[in-house]
Swiss-Prot record:
Organism (species): Chloroflexus aurantiacus (strain ATCC 29366 / DSM 635 / J-10-fl)
Source domain of life: Bacteria
UniProt keyword Repeat, yes or no: no
Protein name: Acyl carrier protein
Lineage, broadest ranks: Bacteria, Bacillati, Chloroflexota, Chloroflexia, Chloroflexales
Keyword list, A-Z: Cytoplasm, Fatty acid biosynthesis, Fatty acid metabolism, Lipid biosynthesis, Lipid metabolism, Phosphopantetheine, Phosphoprotein
HAMAP family given in the database record: Acyl_carrier (MF_01217)
Chain positions found as O-(pantetheine 4'-phosphoryl)serine: S39
Designated gene of the protein: acpP
Family stated for the protein in its record: Belongs to the acyl carrier protein (ACP) family.
SUPFAM superfamilies (alphabetical): ACP-like
PANTHER family in UniProt: ACYL CARRIER PROTEIN, CARRIER DOMAIN-CONTAINING PROTEIN
Biological-process GO terms, alphabetical: lipid A biosynthetic process
Length: 82
């Protein structure tokens, strides 16, 4: 399970990148359907996540990240030790 700190860091990135309210950023939220992100938004979001968490997300993996929970699950298993 993702730590509260990880969730908060991810929430801040999503709010900043997509211009949504923090309350909208729930694990089940779809980036495209619920948070109205387009393909460019998603690319920028993935880049911000990579930078913030020190991970490298392949294009193939990025396509699988559809929801906030998907992003958290990816980070849990791939984040480098800080």
């Amino acid at each position: 399970m993702a730590s509260p700190e990880m969730e908060e860091r991810l929430r801040k990135i999503i709010v900043d990148q997509l211009g949504v309210e923090p309350e909208q950023v729930v694990p089940s939220a779809s980036f495209t359907k619920d948070l109205n992100a387009d393909s460019l938004d998603l690319v920028e979001l993935i880049m911000s996540i990579e930078e913030e968490f020190g991970v490298e997300i392949s294009d193939e993996e990025a396509e699988k990240i559809q929801t906030v929970a998907d992003a958290l699950n990816y980070l849990e298993t791939h984040q480098s030790n800080e």
